Structures are given as structure tokens and as C-alpha cells.
């Protein structure tokens, strides 16, 4: 059996990890970095770029560069947060046939799980390159406050990427696992405050020693799935746009190219201001008008940035308060505060958290890597490589059904330990009612319409009877991934109907299978493209080095040699512009052959000059 890898599929960055010889190892990607930007771009020549290469070309290709797609995963197009996002991103967010939020790039409409799958494929390949063997199984993390549709969509993304997702686990819980594995024995209660690129979670977790086993029990969780570093960047972008408008009278909001440059600059300035007191944002040629090019130069102090985002930081405190209340614990009883997510590097965030909990956060947990490390530990637990860990997570939101009068009746309360199963008996609302619709909801509001609809199904052929007589038993069953299975049974006839909640949206099995096939077909295409790109690069490099060599050689090159080399160079340049790898290889060989005598002359001369 192969290794089960741990993947932190983040809004801004992703990370992959593995447990090896009892130690957790974060795996560097092909570029040598321990985290990979969660960015996917579709280049004009059809190449799909993922990570740093996608980020680098974002400025010149803003409409086809997709970032922060995790904020759309498992969401309906009509949701307020999606409508808000449409105004903020340079790429197109569109309404799919099933009402979900999809994205459009390179003239194609795609589901968010397809985009996330590209990032997961990169993480999978990173692990395979390191291990030297195929990887087919993974534990993937999600924000603790993700609802059922978002969890299901994340699982779908794994499937499209060719991964068997063994478990979906909550990010704060994973971070606690990474933190708690090497701690001294004994019981302690920790807070994991996770402010990432797009989401915020807080979990109260009790780490206990039970019969020689490390037990991690989540007591309560809360959060906001649309609050993170991207919002902090946006505040800074808005400020820069306003400052530029005051100075030049020009609005950069309608210029996708300028916005993409501003996004990069804002992210960079925000990071710099975590260690410096001030920084300059200097963007020459940001735009132009009839009078000529315009340059943006704005000085930003740490205090200015803090004033721009203060309310966002304050917004994270209320979920902390609710989580403590739900866990029945006072802030003074918390032993350790663990900060996770890149945005927690901001001094203002650290100060607010320390003020609220009355203690400084620990500094020995890497905020970018802890979640992936915890996922790898959970993978090792599932593989049987780690025996002394028990993880007890919770369902983050209340689950129930719609009952008479549009009321939501709860079956499983929020913060219930999972896996769990609950049943309740309901009846009919009308005389001789022959069918009931089970409308499954998730949320904390009493009014059914105010909660997230997860799906509907019918239990039909109920024998005629006065209202209130039939007994319909509804069962909710949440698995260890936090994914819900619902069943309904007519107790008189024994007739049952059940569904795995796929939401009234989400991807069908057929769609996922098609996307898996597309991904497999693309893999072969990608391989050919990589080979062609490598051949082109080799050709370009040879043209450059040959021309330089001829120039350096001067009159040591005969007219005959010069003519032959120039003809071979022109032929290779023409081949490089085409799509035929074999033709490029042939012209490379030809140029190497005709330039070899000159190279030998130069080498002989250099050797003679050396003492």
C-alpha cells in the first residue's frame, strides 16, 4: 500500500506533507518552495500553469488567471458572497446550469472543483517526485466552518485529480494534531485561531492522555468562510486606487491589468509591513492618458494599514467568543493559543488575539505548514502507521429539516462529535397525504428559508390516513468526513428512501467522471507540451550561445563557416516557432554539427592561453 499524503488545499497557498520514519516532512515543490500558490492559469497556447508560474504571468493574463477559487467551491451563484466576489476578481464568475458558481477562462466554463483539482494534481506530483512512487490516497483539509456542499465539492476535486480522499479533516484540528504530537503527556486545552487567505476558523480543542493514547477532542468550532488575507489585500488595493484617483483623476478599478499589478503590490506591501514600519508602493507606467504615462507611488505606514483593516481583525473576535461559550470554557482556562494561516503574521492580529485570550500565542508552530503536517499525521493514523492518536471532531453547524410553518427543526446540533447518527419521528400535515418532502437544512436560524438548503427528496406511497397519524422516521448520519447521509422510513409500511446529501447543486457522478477523463487526457497532452517546451528552450539557448560564440570568435570564423552557421540558426529559429518537436530536435543537431569546428577552435585557443 502506498503512502497517504496530507494536503492543505488553501485559498492562497497549498502545502503537501508526509509522515516518514516517524517524522512529518513538508515536501518542497519543483521550484524548491514548501508552499505553492493556489493559482491556475490558462495560457494562450493551451498550457495549464499552476502555482508560481501561474502567479508570475497573472499581470499579462488577468482574465485567464484563477486565484482564490476555494471561496467559490460548493457555493450557489446567487449567494451574497459570490456576488461580492464578482466585483473583486478580474476573471469571470458565471452561473452554471445547476445554479452553482462556476468560473470562465480560455473560453471554457469550469466548476471550482476542476480548478482546485489542478492545484491538487500539482501537490500529488510534488509528493510522487519526492517519494519516487505513485500516490493515489490523500487526507485533504477544509475550513472547520465549511458546510456540507463545500466538503463534498472538495472531495470531488480530489477525485478529479486522481486521488482517493481517505478523509476530509478540519484545518484547525489538523494544526492541533501537528502541535500536540510532540508535546509532553498530560491534558491541556488549546485554541487554534486560523486566519488564512480566504477563510477564518477558531476551534477549542482538548488534548488529553487517555489509556496511553493522544486524544484530540474538538469542544467547539466557529468561523467565517469569507474572511481572510484576500480581504486585507482588497482594503489596501482600494486605498491605493483612491490615492491614485485623488492625484491623477483616473480610476484604475476598470483596468484589469493595473488591478492585477496592484494586487501583487498590495500583497507584497502587507507582508513587508509585518516587519517594517513603512513601505513604498512604486508602480511605474501603471496606466496612461492623452498626456502620457502615469506612475503610482504611495508611501504606506504600518499604522495606515492597521487603520484600513482594523474592523476585519475585530470581526474575528466574535467567533472566538462564541466558540468559548459553546465549549463552556473561560478564556483564562486556555493553556495555549496556536496561530495558523499566513495572515496571523500581522502584528495587529497577534495583538488582538493576545488581548482577547490574555496570553501571547505560541511561536513554535509554522502558520503555513502546520495544517498540511496535521493532515499527514491523520493519513498515517488511517494507514495504521500511527497507533496512539484518536481524533474526535465536530459538526460545525446545526443540521435539521423543514417542518410545518417553514420552521427548521434540528436533528443534530452544532458542535456534536462526529461520526454521529440521530433519528426523529415526524408525521403528515394533511389528511390522506400520500408523500412527504424531506427538505434538509444546515444553519443556526429558526426560519427554514434563512438556512442553507442541502437538498430535498420525497418519501412517496404513504397509505391514506388522517393528518398526524403516519409515522415517518427521519435519520441523519454524519460520517467522519463531516458529510451527511439522510434517510426517511414510513414505519407502517417499512418503505425507505435515502440520499447522500449532494446539495441541490454540486456535481453529478457523470460530470465528475467526465472531468476525471479530461484530466487524464490532459496529462498526456501536458507531457507532450512539456517535451515541446523543453525542445524549444534548448533550441533558443543554442541559437543564443552560437551567435555569441561567432561574435566572440571574430575573424577566427571563416566566411564559409559563418554562412553555414547562419543558415542553420535561421532554420532552427523557424523550427522553434512551430509545434513539431522532431523538427526542432533535427535542427538542433544540425546547428550543433556545423558550429562544432568553431567551438573546437575556441576551446583549443583558450587552453593554449592558460599557463
Curated annotation (Swiss-Prot):
Q: This protein's superkingdom?
A: Bacteria
Q: Which SUPFAM superfamilies match?
A: Actin-like ATPase domain, Heat shock protein 70kD (HSP70), C-terminal subdomain, Heat shock protein 70kD (HSP70), peptide-binding domain
Phosphoprotein: present as a keyword of the record? yes
Q: Name one GO molecular function term.
A: ATP-dependent protein folding chaperone
Q: Which residues carry this modification: Phosphothreonine?
A: 199
Keyword vocabulary terms for this entry = ATP-binding, Chaperone, Nucleotide-binding, Phosphoprotein, Stress response
What does the UniProt induction comment state? Answer: By stress conditions e.g. heat shock.
What is a single Pfam family found in this protein's UniProt entry? HSP70
Family, according to the entry, reads as follows: Belongs to the heat shock protein 70 family.
Tell me, what does this protein do in biology? Answer: Acts as a chaperone.
- What name does UniProt use for this protein? Chaperone protein DnaK
Organism in which the protein naturally occurs: Pseudomonas putida (strain ATCC 700007 / DSM 6899 / JCM 31910 / BCRC 17059 / LMG 24140 / F1)
Its taxonomic path starts at: Bacteria, Pseudomonadati, Pseudomonadota, Gammaproteobacteria, Pseudomonadales
Gene assigned in the entry: dnaK
